[in-house]
């Protein structure tokens, strides 16, 4: 028989840098999850991408055990990483902060494809292009 699920926790944590301080500690603590056990498992699984913001969905069961699924980093994080930016533009329609080539967009879309609800790579590329435009990044 399957375990009874008591809740889901969605967090965005820097890869390889999970620690019991907020926001992780309080979020897991209120569900009765062993915080250090999660931190060790998460850090071991994500040590290759150290420092990159990684969304994680934690499923908590009635016996206080848990499983977690890591997702691909958010599109803005990948775009900023590709361009070497700290942040997007405060006024995206007026101030442009960088230029992204179609090849870079294709690379980001390919990486994000498992987590996007796009039917094709072209649709995923359009999604990434829209995100880039809203950050003040030009597509060339």
Swiss-Prot record:
The keyword RNA-binding applies. One or more lysine residues are methylated. One of its GO terms (molecular function) is structural constituent of ribosome. InterPro entries: Ribosomal_uL11, Ribosomal_uL11_bac-typ, Ribosomal_uL11_C, Ribosomal_uL11_C_sf, Ribosomal_uL11_N, Ribosomal_uL11_N_sf. It comes from the Bacteria. One of its GO terms (cellular component) is cytosolic large ribosomal subunit. One of its GO terms (biological process) is translation. Part of the ribosomal stalk of the 50S ribosomal subunit. Interacts with L10 and the large rRNA to form the base of the stalk. L10 forms an elongated spine to which L12 dimers bind in a sequential fashion forming a multimeric L10(L12)X complex. Belongs to the universal ribosomal protein uL11 family. This is Large ribosomal subunit protein uL11. It comes from Citrifermentans bemidjiense (strain ATCC BAA-1014 / DSM 16622 / JCM 12645 / Bem) (Geobacter bemidjiensis).
